[in-house]
Amino acid sequence: VKILLLTRYDRLGASSRLRSLQYLPYFQSLNWQVDQEPLFSQAYLCNLYAAQSTWKDVLLAYMRRFKALTRVGRYDLIWIEKEILPFFPAVAERLLKTRRIPYVVDYDDALFHRYDLHRLWPVRAVLGRKIDNVMRHASLVVAGNQYLADRARGAGARRVEIVPTVIDLDRYPAPVPRSEAADRPLVVGWIGTPKTSCYLHPLKSVFASL
């Protein structure tokens, strides 16, 4: 089996690392060939997290993605994280359907609201139903939770499976019970990004109570 994995990021991106890349050793053990092509580079994320200009990185990212699309015919399956080209109509996904190349699409958050709830009406008008179209034509939609799965089913997806975002317990083993580590501070790991860490702020009181 030959799979082209079109991730959003490389390993520095939490969603790509936890939704697909951590499973690659397992697929390799099945003798599956999985070729990863990230959209955004490590340099892009480093610049983004440092609040530096990223427009050159974005331009290069789209050029790399267009180049990757010229090779889709070599694969049995295309595995897409979220969408092929952000803020573009679903032309690339329709191309796969036209060429009868099956694709699986994975969502770990409500990306569709980036378009259908966008503050600018032209974006809502042109891209508001984009993700629904991507879901509808996918051979499989992998959803991180029930909300995403319901959206996929409502969009007419043929098959939907819920796979929550999890961590690899070989890398992050179960902690020592608190009763055995009362003299040590509680350490909470954040698997998100600096850009999304703001969502932790409303939970300060919860962490303090621990």
Regions from the language model: what does each represent?
Residues 5-75:
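N-terminal strand-loop element at the rim of the active site
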Residues 6, 144, 188-192:
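Short hydrophobic "strand-cap" motifs at the C-terminus of beta-strands
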Residues 8, 78-100, 105-106, 191, ...:
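An aromatic- and histidine-rich active-site surface loop
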Residues 11-26, 30, 35-36, 168-172, ...:
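Conserved catalytic-core segment of nucleotide-activated headgroup transferases in glycan assembly
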Residues 40-52, 103-132, 168-173, 182-184, ...:
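Acceptor-binding helix/loop patch of EC 2.4 sugar-transfer enzymes
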Residues 63-74, 87-105, 111-112, 121-141:
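Membrane-proximal helix-turn-helix segments that form the acceptor-binding/catalytic region
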Residues 82, 145-146:
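Helix N-cap/beta->alpha junction signal
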Residues 147, 166:
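Carbohydrate-associated surface elements
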